Amino acid sequence: MVEGRAVSREAAREIYGVIVREDGSLDADGTKRERAGQRAARVRKDGSVKTLAGKVIAKVTENLDVRKENGSLHCACAKCGADLGPIRDNYKEHCVMEEREITAANPNIGDWKRYIDDKPVFRQFYCPGCGALVENEVARADDPVLRDIELQLH
């Protein structure tokens, strides 16, 4: 990724928690520490995160499950089971959101004003329970959070 300039060394650390040494090699121990620190910083601090113990009935994405809890269907973090709301809701509204400059998504973007009028942003959505990255989106700064998944399960 870094060699192909898909992400810079800085973005690898900031976005993915991957530590790339000056010589281009990966620092596995440093990456483990960085990711643990990032996840700890992203969790909801008010203690209001409910963990679901119900059966996983669907794997929506690598990071998002649907669980049946007390007869109702909820989105949940695939890593820790944190409740991300009923399936009728936008799961992103139950995540911790961080909005970054668009260049954080890709170092090759350059000056966005050359291509579009409205300021774009790079949004990242984290599990409020464990801090794992759940989803990314690129949007205009004034756009509402994208509802990228609609589920109809019974």
PLM-predicted stretches and their roles:
Residues 72-91, 122-126, 134:
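Short, structured motif recognition centered on aromatic/hydrophobic residues
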Residues 1-68:
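Intrinsic disorder at enzyme termini
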Residues 3, 10-14, 78, 82, ...:
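A broad, structural surface signal
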Residues 20-21, 96, 146:
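Short Asp/Glu-rich motifs
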Residues 39-49, 116-128:
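Short, surface-exposed, charge-dense and proline/glycine-enriched linear segments
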Residues 82-120, 140-141, 152:
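Short recognition patches in nucleic-acid-associated and regulatory proteins
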Residues 118-154:
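Short, compact, well-ordered microdomains
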Residues 60-76, 114-121:
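Short, flexible, mixed-charge glycine/proline-rich loop motifs
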